[in-house]
């Protein structure tokens, strides 16, 4: 492991420099991830139709709920790994890695089974109509088939960042984005798979990125790597992961509930086109949220490591700096959406 990839620099390098090194790759990855979500909408809108966009919008709460469970493990594991590394407890950090893998498999399988059986009632509850249910069902069923992959991919990416490889985490996300954007038009227009093609493009791209992550953590020379003895779930580690990840989980859950309520209201008072329009607005807002989340993801390893090393002033410094950047990005997003809203929306139709 090079000095640049060593987590030890988290306790010595200037905070501003560290936040730049860790946040920029995360921002690029999160922004690209948001852009490929927007690309899904653009390809589906032009290749399938407006009702398909409405169907896609109906899946947003369920995908957000899946992301909530992903953040429950991913954010908790990322922070706990950083704390363990700050304490120089490398064996403990490896056990967190093993527990992340098992937890993601368990939660992913449980989530998939539950919602495959309840998919239609859930989508109708979210605001689906007879015109949009087939699009939402076709898309979400395939996404659920790949849900375990999504959970593992998100969890391991979080550990990558915390273990000193923010750029590798970025490359994993960028690879998923590029592959998804390449497969989307091929599957939708070339093969004529419609909205199912977009879902398959998403799943396949994440499988490829997950494969790269598994190869990285299989290397015995890495500080954190797969080995015997780390896969048994430890109550202390699981409790630590879930307690840290509970806050972002509840935030995502509340976001999911808000979207459900709005979709149901729009179905009653605006119809399918109104739901589609709201879906477009959500995708645009999501872009700026992803940038802010990129700063948060860049901050977590720095704050976690220094907390574990008992360098509390550095934890305060990185938190304050991250908050300033977040306010700036949110203000920029607000101004753009107020000044040029029609130009932004035209991309989707």
Language-model features: where?
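Interhelical loop/hinge segments that connect adjacent transmembrane helices in multipass membrane
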Residues: 1-23, 202, 213-255
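Signature of the first transmembrane helix
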Residues: 17-78, 82, 243-266
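Helix-terminus/linker motif at the lipid-water interface of multi-pass membrane proteins
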Residues: 35-54, 123-130, 186-192, 256-283, ...
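Small-residue-rich hydrophobic transmembrane alpha-helices
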Residues: 53-113, 150-169, 278-341, 345
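Mid-bilayer segments of alpha-helical transmembrane spans in multi-pass integral membrane proteins
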Residues: 105-113, 117-121, 143-151, 177, ...
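Short membrane-interface helical motifs at transmembrane helix boundaries
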Residues: 110-141, 332-349
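Alpha-helical transmembrane segments of multi-pass membrane proteins
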Residues: 130-153, 280
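Membrane-interface helix-loop junctions in multi-pass transport and translocation proteins
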Residues: 177-211, 342-347
């Amino acid at each position: 492991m090079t000095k640049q990839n060593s987590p030890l620099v988290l306790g010595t390098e200037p905070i501003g420099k560290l936040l730049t090194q860790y946040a920029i790759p995360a921002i690029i990855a999160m922004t690209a991830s948001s852009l490929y979500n927007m690309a899904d909408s653009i390809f589906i809108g032009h290749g399938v139709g407006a009702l398909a966009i409405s169907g896609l919008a109906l899946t947003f709460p369920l995908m957000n709920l899946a992301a909530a469970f992903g953040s429950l493990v991913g954010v908790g594991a990322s922070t706990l790994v950083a704390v363990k590394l700050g304490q120089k407890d490398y064996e403990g950090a490896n056990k967190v890695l093993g527990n992340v893998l098992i937890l993601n498999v368990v939660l992913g399988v449980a989530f998939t089974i539950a919602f495959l059986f309840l998919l239609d009632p859930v989508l109708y509850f979210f605001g689906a109509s007879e015109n949009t249910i087939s699009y939402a069902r076709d898309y979400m069923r395939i996404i659920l088939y790949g849900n375990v992959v999504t959970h593992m991919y998100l969890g391991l990416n979080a550990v990558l960042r915390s273990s000193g490889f923010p750029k590798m985490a970025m490359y994993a996300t960028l690879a998923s984005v590029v592959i998804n954007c390449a497969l989307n038009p091929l599957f939708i227009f070339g093969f004529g798979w419609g909205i199912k093609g977009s879902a398959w493009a998403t799943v396949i791209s994440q499988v490829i990125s997950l494969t790269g992550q598994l190869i990285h953590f299989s290397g015995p020379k890495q500080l954190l790597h797969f080995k015997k003895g780390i896969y048994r779930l430890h109550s202390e580690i699981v409790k630590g992961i879930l307690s840290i990840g509970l806050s972002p989980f509840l935030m995502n859950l509340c976001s999911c509930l808000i979207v459900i309520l709005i979709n149901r209201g729009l179905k009653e008072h605006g119809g399918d086109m109104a739901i589609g329009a709201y879906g477009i607005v959500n995708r645009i807002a999501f872009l700026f949220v992803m940038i802010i989340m990129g700063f948060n993801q860049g901050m977590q390893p720095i704050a976690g490591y220094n907390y574990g090393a008992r360098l509390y002033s550095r934890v305060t410094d990185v938190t304050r700096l991250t908050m300033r950047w977040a306010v700036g990005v949110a203000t920029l997003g607000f101004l753009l959406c107020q000044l040029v809203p029609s130009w932004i929306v035209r991309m989707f139709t």
